[in-house]
Curated annotation (Swiss-Prot):
PANTHER family: TRANSCRIPTIONAL REPRESSOR NRDR (PTHR30455:SF2)
The protein's name in its UniProt record: Transcriptional repressor NrdR
Cofactor note: Binds 1 zinc ion.
Family: Belongs to the NrdR family.
Any one Gene Ontology BP term: negative regulation of DNA-templated transcription
Zn finger residue spans: unnamed: 3-34
Cofactor: Zn(2+)
Function noted in UniProt: Negatively regulates transcription of bacterial ribonucleotide reductase nrd genes and operons by binding to NrdR-boxes.
Annotated ranges, domain ATP-cone: 48-138
GO MF term set: ATP binding; DNA binding; zinc ion binding
Superkingdom as given in the UniProt entry: Bacteria
InterPro entries cross-referenced by the UniProt entry: ATP-cone_dom (IPR005144), NrdR-like_N (IPR055173), RNR_NrdR-like (IPR003796)
Organism for this UniProt entry: Chlamydia felis (strain Fe/C-56) (Chlamydophila felis)
Length: 152
């Protein structure tokens, strides 16, 4: 790390504290060259590798998850706060797993679990894209499972 004021590479840590609200460590540093003080926050970066359907791996991107949720929940009662809450819950569950390699199937199933609780229309829209139905029968299975009180 370098001093943001003079770009000198030698720094001294003056104080170090937990910052639980940011899930980080807050450090007060002083440059040994210019004497300026500044604060840094250190956080753990856990990267997830997503196994795509075609066999490629790519880094997990929460923005892609949010875009998919936005598309599924457009014109429903799900607002942006709930979209972000669902994305956060999905990401937390994925980070809680021991394996840092996850499949798109795992992500899709988690999203469907949360959407089913939140809004049935968003759930069905997401299922249509995620599951790539081959015929109407597959769609009907999802519709019937989504509405257990309907007669089959």
């Amino acid at each position: 790390m370098q001093c943001p004021f003079c770009n000198h590479g030698e720094l001294k840590v003056i104080d170090s504290r937990n910052a639980p609200e940011a899930n980080a460590i807050k450090r007060r540093r002083e440059c040994l060259n210019c004497g300026q003080r500044f604060t840094t926050f250190e956080t753990v970066e856990l990267t997830l590798q997503v196994l795509k359907r075609d066999g490629r791996y790519e880094n997990f991107q929460e923005s892609k998850l949010i875009n998919g949720l936005n598309a599924a929940s457009s014109h429903t009662r799900i607002g942006q706060d709930q979209v972000h809450a669902i994305a956060s819950n999905v990401k937390s569950e994925l980070l809680g797993k021991q394996n840092r390699e996850i499949s798109t199937k795992e992500i899709g199933e988690l999203v469907m679990k949360y959407l089913k609780k939140a809004d049935m229309i968003a759930y069905i829209r997401f299922a249509c894209v995620y599951r790539r139905f081959k015929d109407v029968g597959e769609l009907m299975e999802v519709l019937l499972s989504a509405t257990p009180d309907m007669e089959k």
